[in-house]
Amino acid sequence: MIRLTLAALLVATPAAAADMAFFVKNLRAQGVAVELFSRDSDKVWPGGNKVFFIRPKAQKSVPISCTPGERICWGAWVDGNDQISAGVGPDNDQPCDNCCFICTEHSTETIDLVQ
């Protein structure tokens, strides 16, 4: 009976979240806003209509919790002008070949925002 209970708990336990980070380097002369979007769910980081703001010529480490194996894409745009954007853009609707990463425990991915 105990084995059945343990087996049921193992099956019912959701996948543990992975903690990873994105190291964002803003090489632009303007401040930029950045959001991270899951391609496997409706999750957005930081969420709640907020953004990660990176000052001009600055860098920031952005820690997140995600589901291992989840595909995460970044979108960035000049603060105050979302017509100048990179990655998947502010609405997560732009094509992009190199702006997505796989959620992996204890990993750090680098995003370079250039002119």
Q: What are the functions of these language-model segments?
A:
Residues M1-A7:
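Sec-dependent signal peptide recognition
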Residues A17-C66, G75-Q115:
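Intrinsically disordered, low-complexity segments enriched in small/polar residues
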Residues A12-P14:
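N-terminal signal peptide c-region/cleavage motif recognized by signal peptidases
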Residues E70-I72:
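Exposed beta-strand face motif in extracellular beta-rich ectodomains
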